[in-house]
Amino acid sequence: MCDRRHSRDETATSAGESFAGRLISGLGSARHECSDLSDGVVANERGKMSTTMERAETKDQTIEHFDVVIVGAGISGIGTAYHLQSQNPGRSFVMLEAQDSFGGTWRTHRYPGIRSDSDLYTFGYRFKPWTSAPIATAAEIQKYLSDVIAENDLQRHIRYGHHIDSASWSSDDNQWTVNATRADTGETVTVSANFLWMCQGYYRHAEGYTPQWPGMERFEGTIVHPQTWPEDLDYRDKEVIVIGSGATAATLVPAIAEDASHVTILQRSPTYYFTGENRNLLADHLRELDVPEEWVHDIVRRENLFNLRVLTQLALEEPEFAKEALIDLVRAALPPGFDVATHFTPRYMPWRQRIAFLPDGDLFKSISAGQASIVTDEIETFTEHGVRLKSGDELDADLIVTATGFNLSVLGDISFSIDGVPLDLADTVTYRGMMFSGVPNLVWVFGYFRASWTLRVDLVSDFVNRMLSHMDELGAQRVTPQLRPQDLDEKWLEWVDVEYFNPNYLMRSMHLMPKRLDKPEWRHTQDYWAERDELPLVDLDEGCLVFE
C-alpha cells in the first residue's frame, strides 16, 4: 500500500444568462472589468487497473465488478459518462438509473410549460453544440441528451429501473458494494466498484415539498404539486390558485392561463424576475455568416458567461443599484399603475436566491391580458372552496397548485457505510464541494446555484479523471480527503453561507449537508470562474487527498 500523502487542489436569472447582456447594458455594467472567459477498478497488480468488467461469484449470485459506478442518467450522469469514456477510455463503468429512461428532471417533471431556467449554451455541455432557442422545453432537452447518448454509444452502459438502496465501502477490498432493487422484478442486484460517482441530483424526484396548511383536508377541489402533475389533470375553464412565485410558478402560470378560467398567483413574498426575448442575437448573426455550430456554441457560451459574471459582480458589489434596475425592467413590462412595490419588490437583495427568467415576458403578458393575477399575502387556512388569507380575503379555486419547492436529497437518500459504520455526511467536511472528509473513492456532482448546473459537470469530470489517472501513476487503490494538521483547529461552518444564498429548500435541509471550512479546499465556492481557473491547477500532492 502506498503510504505517501497526495493532494491537489453547467430558478430564473440563471435562466436569463443568454440574455444577461441586455440587462447588463441597462445596468450600466460596462464599468466593471472581467477577465477573459475561455472556457470497474480491480487491482490485478500493484498500480494497475483492470480494463474489463469482472465478476465475483458469491453463494447467492454473481456480483459484477466495474472500475466506476455512475449513479444517475440525467444531465449530470450523461455528461460524466461522456468525460469518463473520453478521458479514461480503458475504464469499465456502468450507469445505474432508478427511472425507466434517461433525463432525470427532464423526464420526471411533466407539468405544463416545463422548460430550462438556464440558457442551453451554458446549461448544455461544452462538447455538444446547442442549436435552438436559448431557453428550451423539456422535450428539446431530452432530444439533446438522446443525441449525446447515441453519438457516444453510452446506451450500452445504462441500466434503467435500478433503485439503489445501499452502498458500503470495504477498506480491505478497496471497493464499494452497491445494492439496488430492480423495478421490473423487485429482485436485489449487487454490483461492486472501486469508484462511486454520484450524479443523482440533489432533490427527491418522487415528491415535492408542500407545507401542511390548516384545513387542507377540507378543500373540495384538487391539490397538486407540479413535481407529481397527473397527465390527465384537466384545468380547462377552472379557477386555479398557484401557490409560490419561483421559476416553477413562473413557467406554469402562462402555460395554463389561456385555458383556465383564471389563474391567481398567491405568494408570501415577491421574487426577482428578468425578461427578454428567447433568442440570442449573436448566435443568429454568426449562423447567418455560416459559422460552424461548434464555433457558435463556444462563442455564445463565452459571451453568456462573461455577461453573467458581470451581472453577479454588480449584484454583490452594488446591490441597491442592481435591485432598482431589475424592478424597473419589471415595471416596464406591466400595465401602467400596476402595484410593483407590493408584488414585485423582494425583501432580499438580488442573487440571494436565483432570479427567474421569463422568456418573451410570458408571465407578464398573462397578467396584462387579465388571464392571471397576483396576490401577496399569507394563508390562514384552506376552506371548502379555496383559501382564506391572513388579511381576511378569500380566494376561490377548483384547483390549487403548490409550486412550493422540493425536498433536498443528500446523495439520493442512499444508506452509506464505511467499513460497517453508517455514514452521516453532516459529520464530514466537503472537499471542494465534490468529495467528503474520511470517505474514500466517492464523488458527488453538485452544480452551481447562480450559474448553470452543467458547467460544474464538466469541471468536476476533468478534475476527477485527472485524479484517477494520478492514482494509476502512484499505484494507489483509494483516495480519501483528509483534514491536514493546519485544518484541524478550523471552525466547521454550514455547507453554504446563508448570507449570500438562502433558498428555502436549502435552509430546510442544511442540517443534512456536510460542513465547510473557510478555505477554498474545504468548501463549495459556488464560483464557476474561480473553479474554472483553479481546479486544473490543483496540486494533487498538496496534502488534502490521501492516496493509498
Residue ranges of model-derived segments:
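Beta1-alpha1 glycine-rich phosphate/pyrophosphate-binding loop at the start
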Residues: 63-158, 267-268, 333-338
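Short beta-strand to alpha-helix junction loop
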Residues: 129-147, 314-318, 350-362
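Short hydrophobic core segments
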Residues: 71, 191-203, 241, 396-405
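C-terminal catalytic lobe of FAD-dependent flavoproteins
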Residues: 328, 332-384, 395-410, 493-548
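Rossmann-like dinucleotide-binding core of oxidoreductases
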Residues: 62-65, 70, 79-80, 86-92, ...
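Feature captures the FAD/FMN-dependent oxidoreductase FAD-binding
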Residues: 134-202
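FAD-site-proximal beta/loop scaffold in flavoenzymes
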Residues: 222, 226-228, 385-388, 407-444
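C-terminal, flexible cofactor-proximal segment of oxidoreductases
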Residues: 272-275, 429-430, 441-548
